[in-house]
Amino acid sequence: MEAEDRQALRRERKRLKDKKVRRIVWIVLAVLLAAIVILKLCEVDFGSLSGGSGTSSVLTGNFPYALDGSDGVTVHKQGAKLAVLTGGSITVLNPSDGKEEFTAVHGYANPITAASDSYLVTYDQGGSKLRLDYSGENLYEIENKTGLLCADVADDGKVVYAAQSADKRSDIQVITKTRADKMKYSLSYGFVTNIAIRDNGSQVAFVAMNSKDARLQPKLYLMRLKDTEPYASFDLPGTQVLDIAYRGSSLYVVGGSFVSVVNGDKLETVLKNGEVQTVAYDYSTSGDLVVAYSSYSNATQNTVARITAGGKVQKPFTVQGAIKDLSASGSRVAVLFADKIKIYKLSDGSVVHTADCTDAVRSITMMSSNVFVQRQSVIEKEETKS
């Protein structure tokens, strides 16, 4: 009996010890969970976008909006909506309250998106799949066997895309929102790096990149959908082409060290190669290009200018500090620095709003009087007075 009593006592002691260990483990887990929550709240830092004189920082509706990841995030203006691309999904947000109007998982390895007023084209660059979405509905997803290079979408839902060619270098194709073929063209000169379609879907532009003696040789082509060959082509400066975009009948060409505007079959270089370094750019609601540039790389003094479709540089002004991003809306431009967001009047360069931020802010998107701030895995809304 004594032996049995001792065994029973040992079992009871072991049970109490195990219970104590489990209690300690749960306490530790609870503390860790609380610490994680606190760290996340500190990371979001809701109060760090406090405005300066005459400003108001208000978080409304579902803002701050939580993203499903922090890598590869881009925010686009899609008409009066916000299109948000992450490494896992494409989402359209109502900018007034942050509510999702559409979201879809894309499953692409290297997703890129382009937006018109109503349509979104999202594709897997270097991969095979491309999808077109409209007002919360997926119209189609196609598969290309040779590898997609770039794509754009018009206001009427036409999609132009370039892919690697089985016979030449690049294939350019235009399809409608119902997947009807409208144009096909194959190019031997080089791989297409940039592509654009006019708002009304009547013509396209694309840049093909070649090289000689270790020097880049980009060439711009213009082509009407009704034609079988480009109606114009231009040799561009030997630097990276950052973007091409139609605004009305005019085409902007933004290079790493130049800016040009094409009207008809004439190209005018507005900012000359070798004299500027492009830092950041955006397009205003009026159709003008707003660009920040400096005289050399990594400069802390930059010039911000509005360039009209006619190729005129309107009232450039100087800002101090390294620029991370900018976004234009109407007559104003928001500029992101390492520790601040400043909003300037394009007419005279005067500062109308200042908000503090941290270096964790990666991009900004301005719509009307609001600035949407992407910080890691959240999008915050900064409201300013008009």
Regions found by a protein language model. Give the residues of each.
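N-terminal Lys/Arg-rich, disordered targeting/topogenic segments
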Residues: M1-R23
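Structural motif
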Residues: E43, S89-T91, S128-L132, D167-V174, ...
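A short beta-strand motif characteristic of beta-propeller blades
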Residues: S53-D68, D97-V105, G136-E143, A180-S186, ...
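Repeated scaffold domains used in trafficking and secretory/extracellular systems
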Residues: A66-K77, G107-S118, T146-G157, Y189-D199, ...
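Residue position within the beta-strands of beta-propeller blades
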Residues: V84, T122, Y161-A162, A205-V207, ...
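Non-cytosolic head/periplasmic domains of membrane-anchored proteins
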Residues: F102-V207, A214
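Solenoidal tandem-repeat scaffolds enriched in leucines and small polar residues
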Residues: K168-V262
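Blade-level signature of beta-propeller repeat domains, shared across WD40, Kelch, NHL, RCC1
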Residues: D356-S386
